[in-house]
């Protein structure tokens, strides 16, 4: 049985194909969905601004009469606002070229209509919550569009990012996705999510085989920068010679460090004897010292028998790289290394070459503003941008998560054609996001500061039309919640009190003895 439609107002004189002004004698909410019937179509609209007015209060009212006016004004309230035209419900949200005529009736959109728009799982969608103004209407997003067009999850600290990302992860795992999380704070290693009784979280070993590094990645570990031209030249030559010898079988992989340092020592001796390069000797000694320091400093990170991190990734698993115990420099190198390898291996598979990765991967970068910074150049930023530009062709999706959008590289952010934006208060953050997302209107931006925890603006290719959504609670548990300082202080003091009681009891027993 069809729902009875509720008329809430009419269109006013001024309208365009994309926007219409309206008046309503009923209380209507910002963000509510409405239906308009014109051009033989059922057109969905979204109330993007609203104001309230009464003719009883004018600029010259007498303050002493305000109480009398209040008693009768509630019966003469009118609501004025703007409706954004979203499209024809029955024609894939195609926007009619003709604006709605003045006087067109406006109805509250039925739940059935909204379900038709925001959909159900067709095998490629996941539910992330319900409409903010209609709790009975679930909101589904398209996983293929998330992976191919990328995603950004943005909010202030405590706005609900961790729960939102967890909901996305759980939905993808139900589709047997290979999800990779670059976990900056160790929140996801304890993520408790089970499929058929099995915990599907896989912690990847944070070990690197230097043989698998690119020269630029290796050079970064050795602290040889772009301006150290002479050191760079000799280290590059020694590194490539060593890798070629390992690849050809001339030496075993466990001889890597010895051969590398041996090459540099040979160059040092050549510089001693050859007057043409004698001025290079000091630089060669310097880079040899850096390699020795590097081998010692990263002895726990490097493993000459470790298989590549990318080869450890599995489908139907939450694959986690825990960066909570390493500094930003190491995190930068590893993220760039993994993204580079993912892109190269997916290209090989798609083009039919051996050594490729046979399944798509969705990578989630927490604290994305650190490694894809708007002000600092990092190796990661380059590969994040590469994956964002090329990933859709090869089944590589990217999710950027940040509580500091203004510090996030606008080029990387603009490549995320899907966004889940929770509460954002800072105007500079709002402007930065709007600059990256051309479809984000000023009216929608204004709503971001008034969102409550867990409420979000969801937009992009993954959803038919922008929506204000109440994100559902994730089923899995993780350690991303705020810690209670008061509770922890109380526990410490209780331990001290218990210890003092034990000491007092001990001395009391001694005295009796």
What positions do the PLM features span?
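Conserved P-loop NTPase motor module
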Residues: 454-513
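Conserved nucleotide-binding/hydrolysis micro-motifs of P-loop NTPases
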Residues: 52-53, 87-90, 185-189, 325-328, ...
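Loop/turn-to-beta-strand initiation segments
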Residues: 175-180, 316-318, 358-362, 394-399
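P-loop NTPase motor domains
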Residues: 186, 190-192, 210-386, 452-456, ...
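Conserved ATP-driven motor cores of ASCE-family P-loop NTPases powering translocation/secretion/packaging/pilus
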Residues: 224, 388-392, 397-469
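Basic- and hydrophobic-enriched, low-structure N-terminal and domain-boundary segments
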Residues: 1-154, 168, 357-359
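Glycine-rich phosphate-binding loop of nucleotide-binding enzymes
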Residues: 123-204, 410, 458, 489-490, ...
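Substrate-engagement module of ASCE P-loop NTPases
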Residues: 172-174, 342-350, 383-399, 439-442
